[in-house]
Amino acid sequence: MSAYRFEDKTPRIHPQAFIAPGAYVVGEVEVGEGASIWFAAVVRGDLERVVIGPGSNVQDGAVLHADPGFPCLIGPSVTVGHRAIVHGAVVEEGALIGMGAIVLNGARIGKNAVVGAGTVVTAGMEVPEGMLALGVPARVVRPAPPPGNATRYRALAERYAKGLSPMALPRRYRLTLRGQDALNPFSELHLRLKREKGVLETLRRAAQGFPLEEEEARPLLLEGLIAPE
């Protein structure tokens, strides 16, 4: 998670919220209990406040921002889909903003309403409660099916909070002088390492430029046979 104070504006993030690695939360931002902000999302409260209500989710690559006089207010149990933009708008409880949709300053999305993927809701437009808006520019077309995504994402965020952990990727290593000596079949070091299962085979792979997993590189590093490139 990357959370930043901007001047005198500081994010307030509930301890039970989930902020994925690589997401950015900046300035006057309030994140409610059980809310989630996913990978590569940006929530920027530098010019005006941004509020994300309890149980809401801001999915991967989405952007929330606001202009002076137009706060970005996301109600409880709202879904903001992948790469969607909500800019200075109000999104009421249970609504869904589809993938790649854009909602502009002063717009209001009613309770349990749905903005379809790729739709552009123009400045000041209102989408009534429980209705579906589609198109560029958006038009209200019919009643929306119940969104329901927020509950699923809240459960997923709880799993991520417990189960997400970084892992080391395979990397290439160069042979040290000691490592080069170890590949000399007449050296004492080579004869000793022959008795250690797999060490010389792994060393040869490193010499050929193959990436090594952390676990297989460790004994070679301890022996001083290889060094990171």
Go through each PLM region and give its residues.
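Glycine-rich hexapeptide-repeat left-handed beta-helix
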Residues: M1-I13, D46-P54, D60-A62, A66-I74, ...
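Extended, small-residue-rich solenoid/repeat segments and analogous flexible loops
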Residues: M1-S36, V42
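Short Cys/His-rich Zn2+-coordinating modules
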Residues: A17-F18, I37, P76, I97
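Small cofactor-carrier domains centered on a conserved lysine used for covalent cofactor attachment
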Residues: W38, Q59
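A hydrophobic, small-residue-rich beta->alpha segment in the mid-to-C-terminal subdomain
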Residues: L134-V141, R192-A207
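Acidic, low-complexity/disordered tracts enriched in E/D and polar residues
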Residues: K162-E201, L222-E223, A227-E229
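Short loop/turn hinge sites at secondary-structure boundaries
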Residues: G163, R205-F210
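Short amphipathic alpha-helical interaction segments
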Residues: G209-L222
